Amino acid sequence: LSSWKPLTAPVAGFVALMGVGTLVPALAGVMGLALPFFGLILLGYVLGKLLDIEEAGLGWMNAFIIYLALPALYFNLISVTPISELANWRFILVTSLCTLTAFAAGIAIGWFAAGGRLDEATIQGVGAGYSNVGYMGPGLTLATLGTASVAPTALIFAFDSAIFFTLVPFLMGIANGAKESFARTGLLAMKRVLTHPFNVSIMLAALAAWAQWTPPETIHKILVWLQNAAAPCALFVMGVTVALRPVRGVAKETPLLLLVKLVLHPLLVWVAMTWVGGFNPVWVYTAVLMAALPPALNTFVMARQYDVYVERASNLIMAGTVASVFTVTGLLYVLTTSAGR
């Protein structure tokens, strides 16, 4: 029975939100959008706490998600998107600058919290600026804003990944005395960005959109099946991953980092895109929603890769995911009301 104790609060919170959606008709629509996503995360969390299965068991499911399911989702939706939408450099510039600003704010917080340790500050910056654009982003934006959100979702994923997979190795190289040359570090980072399965699928989809090519019926059906599995599998794995991380208290800087990630980052995106102007409203809503997502699981992956801030990165992701149930749900209400859905 002791294994049920960690489940009491998240399950009770989820049931309470369902009750709110039932009792307040105005919120029923947004709860219907948000709760299935967080419900799948909760299911993964529950099984992760109850079943005695080693974390290594997630390996093949992660491979399925990263190499097949999410790439299929990106390919299917982007390949039918007009190529002109995929070359929206104003959008790329604005959203990337906002991400860099949130990253820099997180590094500044981490610098003071860690007593000037650049390696720890860098991981904290990742937690403050890198949204969960891979596992949560595509399914949530598609369900909320429709197929018009696919192109901006893909662009944000591709360029946010490029930012963090490039800057983090450089900053860690500086923090660790630059044991490898910056040129070699840059080449390795670029290789990692260009060969990431998500980015490969985005590039192939853009090529297909440019050539107006459609896959044969058999291939198309396989891609559709994979696409349909993407969101449920990704969210379930996210829940299990969070459940398997040890929680031993919240670091003093965590609330500030989450304030940047969940509140200031989306607010900055909204202000910047409104100020620049000329964007399709769906693209604005997509960018704001992507910025409001909790810290990416890659925060923990990078922390473990460099063996720094590992446990606190795990706690940051868990706290951010729990807090985002309320912040993202509130944002969804605002967006769906603004979009007239």
Predicted regions and their residues:
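Alpha-helical transmembrane segments of multi-pass small-molecule/ion transporters
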Residues: 1-341
